């Protein structure tokens, strides 16, 4: 960059005369508790009501993962059509949640579950497939076929 342009930019940032220091950029540090307080105050404006007795909340994403809340705090404002779920969230694959989550799945999730079920046996078979060395050993145990049984059955039918 040109020295003249650089000097102009430096002069714009300077506070006071030539001998004073440049101003420092103020950095605002936000904590999680401050965000929570701001969120709770916004929810109070919406007049949310606590909903008791909810043991778990599962949010199923398009990619097949589930956001799982165990014993969450659920608040709702029906007039604003807003629900707030707070608590410890865990991202889990849908296969880990399967036995208990089937009743919660919708039509879209069931079709994606079918696709996942089709892929699952292939993965299991690929992992359990015998190695080429094992195949050679197994071939020794099976006797060779001496005659063709299909031709013999055709001859009997005639």
Curated annotation (Swiss-Prot):
InterPro entries: BTF3, NAC_A/B_dom_sf, Nas_poly-pep-assoc_cplx_dom. SMART domains: NAC. Residues 33-98 form the NAC-A/B domain. Residues 134-150 have a biased composition (Acidic residues). Residues 124-158 are annotated as: Disordered. Belongs to the NAC-beta family. PANTHER family: TRANSCRIPTION FACTOR BTF3 FAMILY MEMBER (PTHR10351). This is Transcription factor BTF3 homolog 4. It comes from Gallus gallus.
